[in-house]
A protein has these predicted regions:
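N-terminal, polar/charged subdomain of small-to-medium soluble alpha/beta proteins
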Residues: 1-118
Length: 118
């Protein structure tokens, strides 16, 4: 069994214009993002995954309009994370707390994963 390193950035906070309703594209809304990557253990610092790069990756995806669906954001971030050197698996969760539905709820959340399962 090969070993791996798990790196998680939990509850990153962004304010973005997201949604398909006309007013959603005008006013930034909060989104929370979790990004976990699994990587081969680094034998030296040059091969380590830098979590600052992971944060910049998430911020870049969320700064690229149009943002209509949580699913698209999650899939795009997953694809970008999996393209990073040394990354062998990734999991992304995107949460939108203010969802226009007829009943109360904490948030809408989309979770996508690719690669290793631990």
């Amino acid at each position: 069994m090969s070993s791996s390193v798990e790196i998680t950035l939990r509850n990153m906070q962004f304010h973005v214009c997201i949604g398909v309703l006309p007013h959603e594209g005008q006013l930034p809304q909060p989104l929370a993002v979790d990004l976990t990557v699994w990587a081969a253990p680094a034998v030296d610092d040059r091969l380590a995954v830098d979590y600052r790069d992971l944060y910049r990756l998430a911020a870049g995806v969320l700064a690229t309009p149009p943002l209509l669906y949580l699913e698209t954001i999650a899939q795009t971030l997953l694809r970008e994370a999996m393209a990073q050197p040394s990354v062998i698996g990734a999991r992304v969760a995107v949460r939108k707390p203010h969802v226009m539905l007829p009943g109360p709820l904490d948030c809408a959340e989309i979770v996508v994963q690719d690669g290793v399962r631990l």
